[in-house]
Amino acid sequence: MSVSFDSSAFLATCSGRPGVYRMFDADARLLYVGKAKNLKKRLSSYFRKTGQAPKTAALVARIAQVETTITANETEALLLEQTLIKEWRPPYNILLRDDKSYPYVFLSDGEFPRLGIHRGAKKAKGRYFGPYPSALAIRESLSLLQKTFLVRQCEDSYYRNRTRPCLQYQIKRCKGPCVGLVSPEEYAEDVRHSVMFLEGRSNALSEELSASMEKASMALEFERAAELRDQISMLRRVQDQQSMEGGSGDVDVVAVMLNPGGACVHLISVRGGRVLGSKNFFPQVAIEEEGGEVLMAFLAQYYLGNAERDLPSELIVNVQHEDFSTLIEAVESLRGRSLSISLRVRGTRARWQQLAVTNAEQALAARLANRQHLAERFEALATVLEMDEPPQRMECFDISHSSGEATVASCVVFGPEGPLKSDYRRFNIEGVTPGDDYAAMHQALTRRFSKIKDGEGKLPDVLLVDGGKGQLAMAREVLQELAVPDLILLGVAKGTTRKPGLEVLYLNDAEHEFTLPGNSPALHLIQQIRDESHRFAITGHRARRGKARRTSTLEEVAGIGPKRRRELLNHFGGLQELSRASAEEIAKAPGISKKLAELIYATLHSE
């Protein structure tokens, strides 16, 4: 129990009403946020002398201050709790890591609408279908629709400026509305069929297509009948694959599985009776957490923490929790929608539930197996580096450029559980001699570790740099300039043969040079982190270089500023399409005179 916190005095004045409590440490850092029907009763349970779970004991040992907020009822307390958790992400709360919005299929307005992927606020005019649990699930649906009904998926800026059909028309993935190869009536029918599929009305769609096929055959329109036959065949294959499809309504099936090594929540999204896909979540939990607590924390954060998230009419779960009724009331209060939570289900819903449980079990087993493998690599590296315990945080820096152009430095971060992608950083390098990797590394490290000097950010246990003695010396110089506390420096050079497995390693002062066997788990970890840093740097460099090259040619044209360049590229759908346009076509763009259009055309086509 904390020696700096007088729990008896605090509890003597604590209210017995519903509310939210916040626990802080001696440095005023928020440790935990909780809610209670009876604040005094709930908080008293933390300060019992016996029977505390390890996680609770560790929390209580750090408490220096507790603050409470009284609310009108439990529902209000739950809503406030979720707001505070989302804002502060306290370390002792069960946290939902992946809270980004799910993608939707978007169907735009207009005579020839397009299908595409959409995330975020629904501001554009059109229809939204979903949400889909992953980008992969939505791409599968869009691919099927493109093959079956040939509705366009190109951006409007690209569509408006076509003068001949693109490759999608040639491979029978589009009917060419951009150049008038399909009538508005025929295209509208394809769009209507796509909507029926997205709404989950596959059976009705198949029946309608079958009737149309028979009608076309009777009219001796055999080409049209064959087209309809292919569409029906494609739909039936989907229905055969979608063995879980059945029933109606919008349902999310959520199952939680626990293991001493972690937890997994598996979510299956069903809309209109059709399973759209599924996704795994791995919340951080203590060993003693119960399934109901983990599930309740997940559901509250998932459905109350994002007002834009699509809400089903029913949740099917695999464990019970006493606060489900409070969650239902909170959802109705916040979202204005009714919600039911079911545990005992039959038929199709029971199959969905069992599948969610099975998927959660398998995903957790696979994650734990991978984590164990990674832990062995960390332990092996600790042995090689003569550390008392495995490193908890490793950072690796790499530089990428093309002959000095668009130089980007990457910083990737790994912990015992794998890559910490939310901590990844890229640095656009400016003001150095093109191609000077040492100066680029100096700038990147200075920008990164200046935050440590200013009291921000986390200090790694091991710092890797992709390079030999020179890069390692540069890293040492930066750390000394910034007076960064001691940490282990490791340089990774490719060796004379530049083959994987034959890397030369340099430790700290670069005087200690060594190699590791090709089958060394420690070397495999170093390679994994180095390769990830290389990948992250290259993707950043390519994006920066591509952006620069798209605009660099136009920068040579007098009278074209950044805003007009951007508008011009958006109008034509990119520099490539702009280059194909005639001077007359360029002059039709907003804000472009005939004289300026001729100048742009001449610049783009000069040798």
Curated annotation (Swiss-Prot):
CDD domains: GIY-YIG_UvrC_Cho
GO MF annotation: an example: DNA binding
GO biological process: nucleotide-excision repair; SOS response
Entries under InterPro entries matching the protein: GIY-YIG_endonuc, GIY-YIG_endonuc_sf, GIY-YIG_UvrC_Cho, Hlx-hairpin-Hlx_DNA-bd_motif, RuvA_2-like, UVR_dom, UVR_dom_sf, UvrABC_protein_C
Cellular compartments annotated: Cytoplasm
PROSITE patterns assigned to the protein according to its UniProt record, in alphabetical order: GIY_YIG (PS50164), UVR (PS50151), UVRC (PS50165)
Domain GIY-YIG: 16-94
SUPFAM superfamilies in the cross-refs: C-terminal UvrC-binding domain of UvrB, GIY-YIG endonuclease, RuvA domain 2-like
GO cellular component terms attached to this protein's record: cytoplasm; excinuclease repair complex
Ranges where the UVR domain occurs: 203-238
Family classification: Belongs to the UvrC family.
PANTHER family, A to Z: UVRABC SYSTEM PROTEIN C, UVRC/OXIDOREDUCTASE
HAMAP family: UvrC (MF_00203)
Oligomeric form and interacting partners: Interacts with UvrB in an incision complex.
Job description of the protein: The UvrABC repair system catalyzes the recognition and processing of DNA lesions. UvrC both incises the 5' and 3' sides of the lesion. The N-terminal half is responsible for the 3' incision and the C-terminal half is responsible for the 5' incision.
Protein name as annotated: UvrABC system protein C
Taxonomic source organism: Ectopseudomonas mendocina (strain ymp)
Taxonomy of the source species: Bacteria, Pseudomonadati, Pseudomonadota, Gammaproteobacteria, Pseudomonadales
